[in-house]
A protein has these predicted regions:
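Short linear sequence motif anchored by a di-proline
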Residues: 1-130
């Protein structure tokens, strides 16, 4: 589960971080794929990827792609279904109700932690929508 995710659109030639979250839920679940394979040194390597889709109209000004966000009624089937079922769910998943706001650039440094990283910047608005 995640509470949201970040995108960094370029606005007036400057990358500006935005936090994106569900409008109607404190958590979301992304569709993802994983595999475990030999690492070539006698061990195993576990890898994963978050599935993306074309951005919905709300997020399109921020980025042209977005994670596949699964509604709660699809969680169990995604985790326990077949690859064919996952593909069908990816195409059938509804567009989620999302909100976003610009956040401080401190989010770009992995040493920074805390709730302040998802807080709106003091101006309270995004340059995408003055």
């Amino acid at each position: 589960p995640a509470t949201g995710y970040y995108e960094w659109p370029v606005i007036d030639g400057v990358k500006r971080p935005h936090y994106i979250a569900l409008a109607d839920s404190p958590v979301m679940l992304f569709g993802g794929l994983w595999e475990t394979r030999p690492d070539g040194a006698g061990g195993w390597l576990s890898t994963y990827s978050i599935v993306t889709r074309e951005a919905d109209p709300v997020i399109a000004p921020v980025h042209d792609r977005m994670p596949l966000i699964l509604p709660p009624d699809m969680h169990r089937d995604w985790l326990h279904g077949s690859a064919d079922e996952a593909m069908a769910m990816a195409h059938a998943a509804p567009e989620p109700a999302l909100v976003f706001h610009e956040v401080d650039k401190a989010v770009g440094n992995v040493r920074n932690q805390g709730k302040q990283l998802i807080a709106p910047i003091p101006s309270g608005t995004s340059a995408l929508f003055p």
